[in-house]
């Protein structure tokens, strides 16, 4: 089993929690190869991660220096926001970053937790698809914004099982690079939109239990529909199954949930599970990350809690699904 992450040095304590949750829940797997595409890690953090993974006899750890995604692949990426890192594009170049003998790999964002065996999912039959993933909750205006056809499904790129053999055989890295250059280095939602646009109808859709993200837990079915106007999505029963028995949990950010589990004062629904696995890492005694929310973000969080959730979702839903796509379209011209 091959697992790959990318991480900066500052996020190592969070990544450690994700890795230990996988190793704890997959002891029956013969071999787990953990690849970390690292961006300027300290030697101390590398040693601590080696010590963590070294406790599991079925696990191997490999560090790979993060390429300069812009220069090495000549993508011409534009820095629209200072917080955006081009490192996230590395998941679309795993065919060349990882060795040729890796023909299947599970890519995970660092903000994920494993809550069960990955074996069944990892062995998914690709059926000539490039990847397997979980649908993100987006409305039709976003599909139109990205010129995606009516049969396509937009997946969250924080968890993707890649068919690297097909990826390499079809020279998808060139396709990705050519597309990004054709957009002058700017694609909204970055690599997530790139992979969805280029792999339309070639991502195998799997059960949401393999990427149970915060939205699924924070809102009722009706309020989620009010908030996101999503029509190309899972059934209510599938979402219930994912929330009640998730295998991969994605600790995504959200305006309605205060903080994420590694932030001081957070109220995330999976904070206790996160802390359970954090206690098994070398970073267990380090303080949680400080809350860096500015006053506007704190005001929004407080305001939306005052309104009935259904009313709040209707208001925010109009902004997110009507005003925002039009604003994005103008910015892309």
Predicted regions and their residues:
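A glycosyltransferase accessory/donor-loop signature
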Residues: 7, 169-333
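Active-site beta-to-alpha loop of glycosyltransferases that engages the nucleotide-sugar donor
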Residues: 7-13
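Short, acidic, metal-binding catalytic loop of nucleotide-sugar glycosyltransferases
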Residues: 21-30
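Short internal beta-strands
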Residues: 32-40, 133-134
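Short, charged/polar "capping" segments at the starts of alpha-helices
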Residues: 40-47, 141
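Active-site-proximal specificity loops/subdomain of glycosyltransferases
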Residues: 51-96
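GT-A fold catalytic core of metal-dependent nucleotide-sugar glycosyltransferases
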Residues: 67-69, 87-139, 152-154, 161-162
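Conserved nucleotide-sugar donor-binding
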Residues: 159-171
């Amino acid at each position: 089993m091959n697992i790959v992450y990318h991480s900066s040095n500052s996020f190592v304590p969070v990544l450690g929690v994700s890795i230990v949750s996988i190793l704890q829940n997959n002891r029956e797997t013969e071999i787990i190869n953990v690849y970390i595409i690292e961006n300027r890690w300290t030697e101390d953090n590398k040693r601590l991660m080696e010590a963590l993974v070294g406790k599991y006899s079925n696990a191997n750890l490999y560090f790979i220096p993060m390429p300069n995604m812009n220069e090495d692949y000549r993508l011409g990426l534009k820095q629209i926001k200072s917080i955006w890192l081009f490192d996230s594009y590395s998941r679309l170049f795993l065919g060349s970053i990882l060795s040729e003998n890796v023909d299947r790999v599970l890519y995970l964002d660092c903000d994920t937790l494993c809550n069960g065996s990955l074996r069944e999912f990892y062995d998914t039959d690709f059926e000539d698809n490039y990847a397997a993933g979980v649908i993100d909750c987006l409305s039709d205006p976003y599909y139109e914004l990205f010129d995606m056809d009516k049969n396509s499904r937009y997946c969250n790129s924080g968890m993707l099982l890649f068919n690297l053999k097909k990826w390499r055989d079809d020279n998808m890295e060139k396709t990705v690079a050519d597309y990004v250059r054709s957009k002058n280095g700017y694609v909204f939602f970055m690599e997530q939109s790139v992979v969805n646009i280029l792999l339309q109808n070639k991502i195998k859709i799997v059960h949401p239990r393999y990427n149970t993200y915060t939205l699924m837990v924070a809102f009722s079915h009706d309020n989620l529909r009010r908030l996101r106007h999503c029509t190309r999505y899972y059934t209510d029963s599938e979402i219930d199954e994912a929330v009640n028995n998730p295998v991969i949990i994605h600790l995504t950010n959200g305006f309605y949930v205060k903080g994420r589990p590694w932030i001081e004062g957070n109220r995330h629904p999976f904070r206790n599970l996160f802390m359970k696995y954090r206690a098994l890492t070398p970073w267990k005694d380090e303080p949680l990350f400080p809350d860096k929310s500015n006053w506007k973000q704190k005001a929004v969080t407080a305001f939306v809690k005052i309104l009935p959730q259904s009313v709040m979702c209707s208001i925010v839903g109009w902004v997110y699904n009507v005003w925002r796509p039009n604003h994005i379209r103008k910015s892309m011209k």
